[in-house]
Amino acid sequence: MHTVQLLLKTSKYERHEIDRRFHALAHLHNVCVKHARKCMIRLQHDKRYAELRQLYNELVKKEKMSKEEKSQKKKLAKQLAACRTKQGLSKASLEHYLKVCGKQFSKLLSSQQVQAEADRVWCGVERCLFGNGKELHFKKLMDFDTIGGKSNKNGARFDLDAMYVNWLGLSLKCYLPKSENSLSYVWESLKGKISYCNIKRLMFSSGWRYYAEIVVSGDAPTRVSIGTSTMGIDPGVSTIAGV
């Protein structure tokens, strides 16, 4: 997989609409974080989960485990996962929760864009549960720079033939680079299958600039650098020498 980032040509109205969508995304993200934090607090007070976790950790600490202990470890892992799911702490649970919350923003964000944000929150939950994460944090509006996608058939859809991004009523024109070398590289990069399209924003002194981040299957093509030095050619009878 590789990405191609193209600047979007936006009008004042389109910039306003995109900003509304980032506001909606920020709201949904923090709603999901609040819900996940409540679920994690309930899990911390679950005595059954604490007992299972203690037994599981005791087995993990052993350098060598018997077949019975390995079987018990798998059984405990399933029971722990069931406890987390019961408290609403699973990827699918968060996706379902935010899907319901996201219905009020159905004209601003697609179902898969809402789902992608739930997945981001779940990544934070995983760090708290299984990694070195200490707490799930709320985010400020300025912290959001990407509205994610999952397929090119839902949400922000990139049209290669027209070089437009069609997104729930918005048709956003993509700028192509002017230099011949960069332009040929972009076209070469877009030859693979378009997986999905993200909407990104970057802050400049003049304000936000918006980009289409197109995710393409396959490896990125090799960029060929064109030199600027002077080269002399000395043609011979059967060979040509370059200096």
Language-model region placement:
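Nucleic-acid substrate recognition interfaces
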Residues: 1-243
